[in-house]
Regions:
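Segments that shape or occlude catalytic/ligand-binding pockets
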Residues: 33-87
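Short coil/turn segments at secondary-structure boundaries
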Residues: 52-56, 60, 95, 138-145
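Aromatic-residue-lined binding/catalytic grooves and analogous aromatic/hydrophobic interfacial grooves
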Residues: 96, 102, 108
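Charged, often glycine-rich, active-site loop that binds/positions anionic groups
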Residues: 37, 93-98
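Active-site loop segments of alpha/beta catalytic cores
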Residues: 1-41, 47, 101, 110-114, ...
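Extended, Lys/Arg-enriched charged tracts that mediate electrostatic binding to polyanionic substrates
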Residues: 78-95, 143-150
Length: 327
């Protein structure tokens, strides 16, 4: 019988392993929402405990404790920064409502009586006439300010890599997602036409933030001699809706995909043996060839209910280039 890492390496190289690999909580996009997790564990008679350092509190995604991951036979283990730095320290509660301002200066609130996750209430650049004007007063966080806290967190994660497929995971949402969070949804879409230079500058700052994060993570992994335990490098950007891409495919090819190409090239240079993973929801078939050309190896979540996302057709057209990772 193969161990988890051997099993995953086979599958990631388009070879047949001893069984289909299974991933639970190997990334922040393949985890499980807190409410669903609690119900599922109670139903199965398993522990309802989860990692107290919640990896993605905004989406209320939790990581089951190691004992549960072992019982559920998850082949993956995550290593990476928390999505909200110092979450337990910065959140406050008034009545049934939890509030926090993250290190991107976004205000989030969750009402325990009705919400399944945090909702965003403010955007740091929404008050300005343009992104260009806003960036004179606000800038993307400098990742160097958070490296020490990341190191403390990943030092606790590293012992659980074992013989599993280690996944180096991102520290924030994707390039378009972060742009939307920072500027606000309606204004960002308008800025693509009214302030294209500002929109590109914001994307550029987020790209550099991500590269700085990845390099700091790889530095630590290599200092600890753990690089052989890492098989996947996980990024994310929801580029699709149920019916189409989020913006025109040509705009994604011009604005977003070249920047992911830079991120993935950097990551491949640092960890040549590991595979580039991307989570992107929705109907994204038109841009899959572009993502492949940019360096994508693994596509998640394969939202087959979206337009033009037939599983058989996707496998026939892209199966030689992409590993399909559900969830």
């Amino acid at each position: 019988m193969m161990n988890s890492r051997e099993r995953m390496i086979k599958a990631l190289n388009h070879q047949e392993p001893d069984r289909v690999p299974y991933d639970l909580a190997g990334t922040t996009v393949t985890g499980i929402c807190k409410g669903a997790f609690l119900n599922a564990m109670k139903e199965r008679g398993l522990s309802t405990e989860y990692d107290a350092k919640e990896v993605d509190p905004i989406s209320q995604i939790v990581t089951p404790v190691e004992e549960t991951l072992v019982k559920l036979k998850s082949d993956t283990r995550r290593i990476g920064a928390r999505r909200v730095i110092d979450y337990e320290k910065i959140r406050t509660k008034e009545g049934s409502v939890w509030s926090l301002v993250d290190h991107w200066d976004c205000l989030w609130k969750l009402d325990e009586t009705k919400d399944f996750y945090y909702n965003q209430f403010t955007h740091p650049l929404e008050q300005y006439d343009s992104i260009t004007e806003g960036l004179k007063h606000w800038h993307v966080p400098d990742w160097a300010d958070y490296v020490d806290r990341m190191k403390a967190d990943i030092a606790e994660q590293a012992p659980f890599l074992g013989d599993y497929c280690g996944i180096a995971d991102r520290n924030c949402a994707g390039l378009t997602e972060m742009s939307l969070r920072i500027r606000g949804y309606e204004k960002w879409y308008m800025d693509l036409l009214l302030d294209p230079e500002g929109a590109e500058e914001l994307l550029e700052q987020i790209t550099q933030h991500k590269i700085d994060y990845w390099n700091s993570l790889f530095d630590w992994i290599q200092e600890q001699g753990l690089e052989d335990k890492i098989q996947v490098m996980s990024e994310c950007d929801d580029l699709g809706t149920q019916r189409s891409t989020l913006i025109a495919p040509d705009d994604l090819r011009r604005l977003v995909i070249p920047r992911f190409k830079r991120i993935w090239a950097n990551n491949k240079k640092r960890m040549p043996h590991a595979k580039n993973f991307m989570h992107t929801c929705g109907s994204v078939r038109p841009i899959l060839p572009d993502l492949i050309e940019a360096g994508l190896d693994i596509y998640n979540p394969v939202q087959f209910t979206a337009k033009d996302m037939d599983l058989k057709e996707l496998k026939q057209e892209f199966g030689k280039d992409l590993v399909f990772w559900g969830g």
